[in-house]
Amino acid sequence: MGKFTVLNHPLIQHKLTIIRRKETGSNEFRRIVGEIAGLMTYEITRDLPLQDVEIETPMGKTVQKELAGKKLTIVPILRAGMGMVNGVLEMIPSAKVGVVGMYRDEETLKPVEYFFKVPKDVTERECLVVDPMLATGGSANLAIEALKKRGVTDIKLAVLVAAPEGVKAVQDEHPDVDIYAAALDDKLLPNGYIFPGLGDAGDRIFGTK
């Protein structure tokens, strides 16, 4: 079973409180979502492998450390997931970006895929799927399945706020995927939103509501 980790770093929790507030405007909301994503990346990548490399400083030659292993591809679930991309890229600027486009059918609450584009070498990379909300788990499951169908085997999921139902849904369908969240909230409401949550992340990021 993949692990589920809540990242309780004080800065993450402080910033999460700001974006939960209903009076927080789109500009501030968008900026802080990126900041939280960057802080989460620091925690998620804590165990990345390192290798020795010989370099030359202004003082002479030395052996130091650099990242080893698979390179990273960030895979945001459109559209809200785009709000987390820059925060991750600030930590790992060499990462590539793929996208999975989905929308939620407001009647069935089920996700519908409408776009998929990833780097050609994605099967040789670790994929970090990002989306601010893990509600029913439908979108995350569909995105992970789309990657697996293309041959990706190393996948992690990073979300800001998760509902218990969404965590269970992903763990049931993709037990090999580790999930990271800034918060595990109380429950999923009948309308498919998370409580207490932070509202519609996409609308708040892009100022469309």
Curated annotation (Swiss-Prot):
The gene is upp. Pfam families: UPRTase. This is Uracil phosphoribosyltransferase. It catalyses: UMP + diphosphate = 5-phospho-alpha-D-ribose 1-diphosphate + uracil. Belongs to the UPRTase family. Its cofactor is Mg(2+). Signal peptide: none annotated. 5-phospho-alpha-D-ribose 1-diphosphate binds at residues 79, 104, 131-139, 200. GO terms for biological process: UMP salvage; uracil salvage. Binds 1 Mg(2+) ion per subunit. The magnesium is bound as Mg-PRPP.
